[in-house]
């Protein structure tokens, strides 16, 4: 029997919605990264974009363990002396709290062209509203998967 290798006609993308309220950031990011890559499917093919479209809501209510809210995110503007930093707490309280989840998922994917393509299938919203009701997404309950996924 030959090893199965998927073709574009074999790929079936679903829409999945995940509520991030009270869920630990790293555990959520690893589940989302697995879904984006398509590794949960038995027909997984490493060089194809087989993953589902994932919608994450309530990104501003994400939880972190320990003192991770005080850890810094660093970036460089490209200009001399342009190193910038902000704590995760400042980002979550700012205008774009979904960037914390976006960065965590991005860093759990391999750094290649395919993962950049797969990141376009991820949509993150700070609040509970999202414009994807027409796609009728399935609810994936991350909280009930494992008791360690939540933090009170």
Curated annotation (Swiss-Prot):
<feature type="region of interest" description="Disordered">
    <location>
        <begin position="129"/>
        <end position="152"/>
    </location>
</feature>
<dbReference type="GO" id="GO:0003729">
    <property type="term" value="F:mRNA binding"/>
</dbReference>
<comment type="function">
    <text>This protein is one of the early assembly proteins of the 50S ribosomal subunit, although it is not seen to bind rRNA by itself. It is important during the early stages of 50S assembly.</text>
</comment>
<dbReference type="InterPro" id="IPR005823">
    <property type="entry name" value="Ribosomal_uL13_bac-type"/>
</dbReference>
<dbReference type="Pfam" id="PF00572">
    <property type="entry name" value="Ribosomal_L13"/>
</dbReference>
<dbReference type="InterPro" id="IPR036899">
    <property type="entry name" value="Ribosomal_uL13_sf"/>
</dbReference>
<dbReference type="GO" id="GO:0022625">
    <property type="term" value="C:cytosolic large ribosomal subunit"/>
</dbReference>
<keyword id="KW-0687">Ribonucleoprotein</keyword>
<dbReference type="GO" id="GO:0006412">
    <property type="term" value="P:translation"/>
</dbReference>
<dbReference type="GO" id="GO:0003735">
    <property type="term" value="F:structural constituent of ribosome"/>
</dbReference>
<dbReference type="InterPro" id="IPR023563">
    <property type="entry name" value="Ribosomal_uL13_CS"/>
</dbReference>
<dbReference type="InterPro" id="IPR005822">
    <property type="entry name" value="Ribosomal_uL13"/>
</dbReference>
<keyword id="KW-0689">Ribosomal protein</keyword>
<dbReference type="GO" id="GO:0017148">
    <property type="term" value="P:negative regulation of translation"/>
</dbReference>
<comment type="similarity">
    <text>Belongs to the universal ribosomal protein uL13 family.</text>
</comment>
<comment type="subunit">
    <text>Part of the 50S ribosomal subunit.</text>
</comment>
<protein>
    <recommendedName>
        <fullName>Large ribosomal subunit protein uL13</fullName>
    </recommendedName>
</protein>
């Amino acid at each position: 029997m030959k090893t199965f290798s998927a073709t574009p006609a074999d790929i079936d993308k679903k829409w999945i919605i995940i509520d991030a309220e009270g869920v630990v950031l790293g555990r959520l990011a690893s589940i989302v990264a697995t879904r984006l890559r398509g590794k949960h499917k038995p027909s997984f093919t490493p060089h194809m974009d087989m993953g589902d479209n994932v919608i994450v809501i309530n990104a501003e209510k994400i939880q972190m363990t320990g003192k991770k809210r005080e850890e810094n995110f660093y970036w460089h503007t490209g200009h001399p002396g342009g190193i910038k930093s902000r704590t995760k707490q400042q980002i979550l309280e700012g205008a774009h709290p979904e960037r914390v989840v976006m960065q965590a998922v991005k860093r759990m994917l391999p750094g290649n062209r395919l993962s950049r393509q797969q990141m376009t299938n991820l949509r993150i919203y700070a609040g509970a509203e999202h414009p994807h009701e027409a796609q009728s997404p399935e609810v994936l309950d991350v909280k009930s998967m494992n008791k360690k996924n939540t933090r009170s």
